[in-house]
């Protein structure tokens, strides 16, 4: 885990949220539209507050959406928590060369939510992961649910001469079968 350097704005937001939620905040990550607070495992409910009271108060104060993310030592679980409530099909972490890469397998229906506008959700997730784990990259695998149609072996449109030839061949085979049965 890298040392986390906080800006003055992040420190102020952490101080405010800790005061209203009465929960220790591990980290704060900001972008243009959102503020994400990382809390210890098991502290999510207390951080959110009854009926989302703490989150609503913070959103009014900051003028931005507030996300509460539960930290976990299990990197796969932590990744799922970062993207919650989006359902990820599978998550695994693998060393690729010098990089530690998080692979996320998703359904095409949630692709837009995972990436976010101009990839902002992925950028935020990677920033959080770099600060709290050794993960350096995220690769998203979108399940392909569309099946490619195979090319027809024969042309779909037949000309009359081909149809007559095939019909004659079928008739000849049927007559051969009848003659064999009679014998």
Swiss-Prot record:
Belongs to the NusA family. The gene is nusA. The keyword Lipid metabolism does not apply. Residues 32-98 form the KH domain. It comes from Methanocaldococcus jannaschii (strain ATCC 43067 / DSM 2661 / JAL-1 / JCM 10045 / NBRC 100440) (Methanococcus jannaschii). It is found in: Cytoplasm. Its main location: cytoplasm. Keywords: Cytoplasm, RNA-binding, Transcription, Transcription regulation, Transcription termination. InterPro entries: KH_dom, KH_dom-like_a/b, KH_dom_NusA-like, KH_sf_prok-type, NusA_arc, NusA_bac. It comes from the Archaea. This is Probable transcription termination protein NusA. SUPFAM superfamilies: Prokaryotic type KH domain (KH-domain type II). GO terms for molecular function: RNA binding. NCBIfam families: nusA_arch, PRK08406.1-5. Pfam families: KH_5. The lineage of its organism: Archaea, Methanobacteriati, Methanobacteriota, Methanomada group, Methanococci. One of its GO terms (biological process) is DNA-templated transcription termination. The keyword Kinase does not apply. Participates in transcription termination. One of its GO terms (cellular component) is cytosol. Residues 149-183 are annotated as: Disordered.
